[in-house]
Amino acid sequence: MEPRPGTSSRADPGPERPPRQTPGTQPAAPHAWGMLNDMQWLASSDSEEETEVGISDDDLHRDSTSEAGSTDTEMFEAGLMDAATPPARPPAERQGSPTPADAQGSCGGGPVGEEEAEAGGGGDVCAVCTDEIAPPLRCQSFPCLHPFCIPCMKTWIPLRNTCPLCNTPVAYLIVGVTASGSFSTIPIVNDPRTRVEAEAAVRAGTAVDFIWTGNPRTAPRSLSLGGHTVRALSPTPPWPGTDDEDDDLADVDYVPPAPRRAPRRGGGGAGATRGTSQPAATRPAPPGAPRSSSSGGAPLRAGVGSGSGGGPAVAAVVPRVASLPPAAGGGRAQARRVGEDAAAAEGRTPPARQPRAAQEPPIVISDSPPPSPRRPAGPGPLSFVSSSSAQVSSGPGGGGLPQSSGRAARPRAAVAPRVRSPPRAAAAPVVSASADAAGPAPPAVPVDAHRAPRSRMTQAQTDTQAQSLGRAGATDARGSGGPGAEGGPGVPRGTNTPGAAPHAAEGAAARPRKRRGSDSGPAASSSASSSAAPRSPLAPQGVGAKRAAPRRAPDSDSGDRGHGPLAPASAGAAPPSASPSSQAAVAAASSSSASSSSASSSSASSSSASSSSASSSSASSSSASSSAGGAGGSVASASGAGERRETSLGPRAAAPRGPRKCARKTRHAEGGPEPGARDPAPGLTRYLPIAGVSSVVALAPYVNKTVTGDCLPVLDMETGHIGAYVVLVDQTGNVADLLRAAAPAWSRRTLLPEHARNCVRPPDYPTPPASEWNSLWMTPVGNMLFDQGTLVGALDFHGLRSRHPWSREQGAPAPAGDAPAGHGE
């Protein structure tokens, strides 16, 4: 009777024992077959040991290639016993199952099994499981050579890569040792302590499997090194937090998981479906619900999962799904209707769809996480705010008090669906409304009131709109209160306010156009500023000209935060050029508009270096008008001074360049035409060479490290690993010459300059700074002394002799003009 090959790791070794006494078989082959059965029985116990680590037994035996079965069986059949014979694998792993005779032959036969038993020293006890080690499962840890079971070490090493007996770091496991001296290895990967030995085992081609230490989520399926590829015989089991489930959990964070479970569980089966993997199963619920309403597949699934009839669940799901697309479009009545539908079905399903509808508008509008405090939101909310504010401001039309109340209500309509903090947006208009009603003296309060939130105006463009409207109201109060000290406060307010209402509407409508132009390019911003400039032929439009300067303040603040000192000063040439012209036109019209335009021109011209004369003249005119105007004139000059401080960085706002968020982080000071870079900080910089480091620079340009392959790796001589990189700066150094000789194509491909601008020049010292040199800590390698980036000298260990290459005689510094050939700027 022929023995049946082991087709599963749970095979009972009892029925296969009798063929050992069969006289027709070879003497040692039944013994090898019995060892295979023992190995499979131990493999099943190994899976139970791994269950203690945190892996369920069902997950390990979900398919035919289990954790222990695939490891031990494939290692046993891949060549540990006999590499020449074809391996015999279970039918689930191979298409054709070998015959029993082939299965016995694949086990290696009697002589090979005896050799392994003799070479392995049978009778050893594993220190982990305290059982006798079967010869096919025997392994020895390197370098301590302690014997263990392979399944035990595959469980132990990922948790702690040390020998269980002597606590020595294990580089690899030695398996399949024969009497002839051949063996195989299982390297331990991802341990920096034993990386060299493990990689050497893979390069030698003896590795038949590998063990990954550390986080099992990052374990690869295979690894290649030295032309050899090693596949993991036992892949990482599906842990509770795999990458696929992490993606599902990320989606759950984006939209809460409770609404997705609601269509699938009714009133009775809520607790039964909670323990399953809900995120992966319920993620397609929202897009799949409309298809289920037409085809009838998902309602059946919902009824089965809930334990109740499918009809009520469908009746509860379909109205909510029908109302979801309008809610995603931005409506709120649909969201409330979704909540009512969920409340109506509360007896069978919890009102879980309501949070999804409540979160739809912010997700659709903001379209990402909340914007950065230094990056304004998109132009969509701003255009919506400006259109509504233009209608509200032009609606009241006549009196000043209705207009101010309209301005106070403007941010509320825009802030409710868009901004998280409405009180900040509405604070400035409310104060300006009280300033309109109080008279000429209180306008000193709105100046500070709208100046305080100025530091937060770049957080959202709605705040910018509210503050601009607040400044417009304060400007109306100041424009009416300045000359009102002489001619009475009531009459100028009645004459100026009706004309100011249309201009407030025009200014509110022009702000989004200007911001969109500034975002699109400098040309659009200049056209917007030029379109705002011709609005000042009459007296009330001097106020509009004054509002043109504060309108650039939000961009100036954000531009200053993003660009720093790199923004060109010529970007602000257009606003100061428009300010003197408006100043001349307004000065010919009335004294009040002259004072306001002079304040605006002084604030705009002080922010540009090219219009300093206009700044001084406008500042003198503003001081003269404030002294002549009395209290109202002093308020106007104070507000002009406040806006001068706010718009002192304004010229950079007209030409934003690229993402402002990263400009400051990537900026660096370069030596060259900048006057500040020519004078570094004085003093000697001491560079001590690193002793005991043997490294070489490999002449292999890395194209993926730099654009043109100007990056060379620095290799450690002991391990061959890349420890650092060298980036070339020009084509004249010794490293560049060697690289050009080794790789001629590099000189044609590189974009490096012929000579670097910040090249090292010889020192210019009248006498050697012996006092500084004597204070150096001297090493046998020698010190290199630099002064402001210039090599001063390298010191010998036995004396203070300068050895820099530009010395004419030993120990004497080179003169100033003795620069090396080819290094002149």
Curated annotation (Swiss-Prot):
Residues 1-121, 221-312, 325-683, 803-825 are annotated as: Disordered. Residues 552-563 have a biased composition (Basic and acidic residues). SMART domains: RING. Keywords: Activator, DNA-binding, Host-virus interaction, Inhibition of host innate immune response by virus, Inhibition of host IRF3 by virus, Inhibition of host mitotic exit by virus, Inhibition of host RLR pathway by virus, Metal-binding, Modulation of host cell cycle by virus, Modulation of host ubiquitin pathway by viral E3 ligase, Modulation of host ubiquitin pathway by virus, Repressor, Transcription, Transcription regulation, Transferase, Ubl conjugation, Viral immunoevasion, Zinc, Zinc-finger. This is E3 ubiquitin-protein ligase ICP0. Residues 479-491 have a biased composition (Gly residues). It holds the Pfam family zf-C3HC4. Residues 658-667 have a biased composition (Basic residues). Residues 1-10, 456-468 have a biased composition (Polar residues). The gene is RL2. SUPFAM superfamilies: RING/U-box (SSF57850). It comes from the Viruses. Residues 46-57, 242-251 have a biased composition (Acidic residues). Residues 368-379 have a biased composition (Pro residues). Its EC number is 2.3.2.27. Gene3D superfamilies: Zinc/RING finger domain, C3HC4 (zinc finger) (3.30.40.10). GO terms for biological process: protein monoubiquitination; protein polyubiquitination; symbiont-mediated disruption of host cell PML body; symbiont-mediated perturbation of host exit from mitosis; symbiont-mediated perturbation of host ubiquitin-like protein modification; symbiont-mediated suppression of host cytoplasmic pattern recognition receptor signaling pathway via inhibition of IRF3 activity.
